[in-house]
């Protein structure tokens, strides 16, 4: 369903991601795990046709991200790290607007809006102004706009960032429900976030893939290995590079 081959993106001399290759099958819920600045959002933006890559290829359902972006936008829904909300709009009106942007036929707009309001538990706030909602509800509105056109694939970039513990639990539950009918890519820098929602994990560090495997297999591998924590006071980047060249060192972060 999603095929990524040797994907790279540079900002001037800095490489944000380098030679990423992975596949995601239909119906999978895949976690994209890595620290802040690892390249997760850059990858999500490329998959969502928002940002061009420097090199490599991406195909989604057979469509080329760089040459057939309009076709891909019909089958994906994207929630960026900062939800694209208009704080002065009423929830219902905003979702109707989002439906028009996604070319939902006018005759189907009302039913599409009502469906996402139901799925995202927004009924009690549907007539309220977005800017006056809690962060948890605003995140629900962000997810609702991502799925307003009933896409096959949902790409969620840090969907619980900045939420309180109760709101995090509620959003996790919502994503788990959506996973029953969508292919989902979820990025996060929080390990429990990934372990509670995803079946397979792609670990990214410094713009490169460190591991791709099922959650169970990765857990087994981590249990077998040893982890060493070092406090580096100077020339940290140089030391990190040298550590990566050592035999039997799987990852350095």
Question: Language model features by range: what are they?
Answer:
Residues 196, 210-213, 234, 238-241:
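Generic recognition of short, well-ordered alpha-helical interface segments
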Residues 2-4, 9-205, 210-211:
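ABC transporter nucleotide-binding domains
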Residues 103, 135, 223-224, 248:
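Residue-level recognition of short, structured coil/turn motifs
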Residues 224-253:
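Short, charged/small-residue-rich alpha-helical element at the C-terminal edge
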Residues 216-221:
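Short acidic-hydrophobic catalytic motif
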Residues 198, 205, 222, 232-234:
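Generic secondary-structure microfeatures
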């Amino acid at each position: 369903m999603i095929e990524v081959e040797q994907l790279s993106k540079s900002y001037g001399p800095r490489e944000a991601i380098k030679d990423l290759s992975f596949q995601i099958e239909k119906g999978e819920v895949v976690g994209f795990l890595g620290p802040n600045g690892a390249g997760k959002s850059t990858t999500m933006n490329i998959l969502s046709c928002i940002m061009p890559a420097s090199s490599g290829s991406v195909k989604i359902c057979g469509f080329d991200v760089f040459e057939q972006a309009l076709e891909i936008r019909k089958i994906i829904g994207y929630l960026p790290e900062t939800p694209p909300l208009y704080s002065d709009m009423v929830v219902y009106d905003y979702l109707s607007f989002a439906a028009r942007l996604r070319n939902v036929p006018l005759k189907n707009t009302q039913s599409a809006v009502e469906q996402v309001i139901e799925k995202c538990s927004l009924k009690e706030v549907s007539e309220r102004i977005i800017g006056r909602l809690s962060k948890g509800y605003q995140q629900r509105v962000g997810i609702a706009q991502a799925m307003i056109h009933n896409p096959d694939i949902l790409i969620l970039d840090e969907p619980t960032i900045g939420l309180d513990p109760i709101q995090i639990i509620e959003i996790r539950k919502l994503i788990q429900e959506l996973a029953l009918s969508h292919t989902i890519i979820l990025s996060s820098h929080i390990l429990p976030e990934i372990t509670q929602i995803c079946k397979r994990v792609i670990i990214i560090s410094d713009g490169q893939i460190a591991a791709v495997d099922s959650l169970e297999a990765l857990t087994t591998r981590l249990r077998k290995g040893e982890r060493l924590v070092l406090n580096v006071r100077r020339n940290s980047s140089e030391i990190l590079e040298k550590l990566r060249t050592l035999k039997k060192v799987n990852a350095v972060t």
